[in-house]
């Protein structure tokens, strides 16, 4: 299996001057995504509120791949700001702008400025399932034990 795949990316006009997503270390799994809101109009994220942040990017993923939009741990740990629908899924056939749905779980307002790294994008292979209807499922030691059944 190859260590890299080619992913076509296009910057929209409102992302002009911003860096393309990039890995921040040699073994990073995610490419950092930047906010592409206007420099004249920072987004204010009040506690308990959410906002769709533009990235100004569109991508063309190869067939059988997806991109997952995930939180940046520093924003969550320091400010309580995270990706609301984590992980957000970008399908291989989607060609629209990548948006990041951020929510503020913190106690203070959070300002999102143009160019700020707001999320990370992980490219991952997809295995498609063929669902087979059955009358019964095979038995397991766990059985129907659900939430909390394997311990605290």
From Swiss-Prot:
A GO term for molecular function: magnesium ion binding
Sorted UniProt keywords: Hydrolase, Magnesium, Metal-binding, Nucleotide metabolism
Q: Which reaction does it catalyse?
A: dUTP + H2O = dUMP + diphosphate + H(+)
Q: Please tell me where substrate binds in this chain.
A: 72-74, 85, 89-91
Q: In which pathway does it act?
A: Pyrimidine metabolism; dUMP biosynthesis; dUMP from dCTP (dUTP route): step 2/2
Enumerate the Pfam families for this protein.
dUTPase (PF00692)
Q: What is this protein called?
A: Deoxyuridine 5'-triphosphate nucleotidohydrolase
Gene coding for it: dut
């Amino acid at each position: 299996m190859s260590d890299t795949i080619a992913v076509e990316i296009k910057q929209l006009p409102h992302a002009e001057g911003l860096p393309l997503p990039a890995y921040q270390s040699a073994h990073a799994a995610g490419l950092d995504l930047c906010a592409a809101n206007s420099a004249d109009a920072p987004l204010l994220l009040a506690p308990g509120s959410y906002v769709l942040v533009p990235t100004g990017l569109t991508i063309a993923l190869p067939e059988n791949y997806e991109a997952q939009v995930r939180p940046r741990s520093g924003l969550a740990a320091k400010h309580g700001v995270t990706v609301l629908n984590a992980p957000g899924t970008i399908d291989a056939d989607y060609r629209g702008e990548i948006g990041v749905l951020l929510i503020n779980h913190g106690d203070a307002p959070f300002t999102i400025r143009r160019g700020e790294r707001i999320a990370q994008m992980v490219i991952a292979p997809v295995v498609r399932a063929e669902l087979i209807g059955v009358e019964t499922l095979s038995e397991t030691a766990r059985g129907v034990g659900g939430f909390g059944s394997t311990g605290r």
